[in-house]
């Protein structure tokens, strides 16, 4: 095997697989801590897996001798990140299992190689139906949901995914919860999937995190998504990212949403709201994580009292007339949500001191968020 490849692109791809490689476990001799490289035609195929997640990408390469090898992934990335030339030449020694890497005057050889047949075969999910969604939309949906996943419980350790068919188009919806908050976000897609095709899949948290990282490296391209019975595959350009789906049964979130009936609605400027929460955070602690909202005519007072640290409060003028209301929420829940939203304003829908808060974005009907209240400790 002998080929030349763009150094920067190879580093980018090797960096992308590290989250998968790290999952291989503490046995560093495991083949799962290796990356599979195959030079064929005019491309280099890069494959990494931990059985639950599989990453396959194809890079343009000048291939002089075709072949394949497994190389310790972290070591290969360490080597490649030290190289400064635009092109790196890589070859496999004919006499022993050793990979030679050269760039400019720098020359490495690594013995941490295994035969290609040791690597697990790649079996992507098969389905006649796929959908296409823009990278920008998929990234927004992921950002607006991944923060409220509960990793400790199998049935909610991931994003519930379903297809919603509306008159305005077909939407891919993701729903996440940790039992104390619920996030719903959806994005328009192109394709022939109907509501029965996806059949309420549960995407695991680790896959969501890897997808979120991958979307940051692409621009206006589209993702093609395929759902099998037990697997899903997200592909873009020459990259395929496939993973096993979770078995858990997600709670009936529609039942939760149908019980909401907020009669007090307040619109806040997100930037100002976030700024106040930062000041609230000065006095939050493990024993005092809640922030109190006191709503009255034309005013919302946000406050915290920590018996060990001190207190803070700040008023926001609001367009509200009605009964007074005091309600407390986790400071971190609102902080997480505001950090995920790209919006100028947010609307809080309230109804009583022990009922959930419905958070929406004015002018948008593709997302909503539910936050459970806390007992007022201040």
Model-derived regions, located:
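Structural preference for solvent-exposed beta-strand-turn elements
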Residues: 1-378
């Amino acid at each position: 095997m002998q080929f030349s490849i763009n150094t920067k692109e190879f580093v980018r791809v090797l960096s992308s697989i590290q989250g998968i490689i790290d999952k291989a476990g503490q046995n560093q001799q495991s083949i799962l801590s290796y990356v599979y490289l195959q030079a064929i035609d005019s491309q280099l195929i890069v494959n990494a897996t931990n059985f639950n997640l599989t990453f396959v990408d194809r890079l343009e390469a000048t291939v002089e001798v075709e072949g394949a090898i497994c190389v310790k992934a972290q070591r290969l990335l360490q080597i490649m990140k030290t190289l400064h030339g635009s092109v790196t030449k890589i070859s496999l020694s004919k006499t022993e299992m050793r990979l030679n890497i050269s760039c400019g005057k720098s020359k490495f050889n690594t013995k941490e190689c295994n035969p290609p047949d040791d690597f697990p075969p790649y079996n992507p999910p098969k389905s006649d139906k796929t959908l296409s969604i823009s990278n920008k939309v998929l990234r927004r949906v992921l950002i607006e949901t991944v923060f409220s996943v509960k990793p400790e419980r199998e049935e909610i350790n991931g994003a519930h995914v379903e297809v919603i068919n509306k008159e305005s188009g077909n939407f891919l919806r993701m729903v996440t919860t940790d039992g104390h908050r619920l996030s719903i976000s959806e994005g328009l897609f192109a394709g022939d999937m109907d509501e029965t095709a996806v059949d309420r899949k549960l995407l695991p948290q680790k896959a969501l995190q890897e997808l979120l990282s991958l979307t940051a490296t692409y621009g206006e391209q589209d993702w093609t998504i395929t759902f099998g019975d037990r697997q899903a595959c997200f592909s873009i350009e020459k990259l395929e990212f496939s993973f096993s789906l979770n078995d858990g049964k997600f709670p009936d979130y529609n039942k939760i949403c149908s019980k909401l009936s907020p009669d007090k609605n307040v619109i806040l400027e997100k930037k100002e709201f976030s700024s106040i929460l930062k000041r609230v955070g000065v006095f939050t602690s493990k024993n005092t994580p809640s922030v109190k909202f006191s709503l009255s005519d034309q005013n919302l007072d946000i406050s915290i009292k920590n018996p060990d640290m001190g207190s803070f409060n700040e008023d926001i003028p609001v367009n509200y007339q009605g009964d007074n209301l005091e309600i407390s929420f986790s400071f971190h829940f609102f902080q997480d949500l505001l950090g995920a939203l790209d919006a100028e304003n947010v609307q809080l829908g309230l109804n009583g001191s022990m009922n959930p808060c419905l958070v929406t974005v004015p002018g948008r009907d593709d997302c909503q968020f539910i936050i459970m209240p806390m007992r007022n400790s201040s």
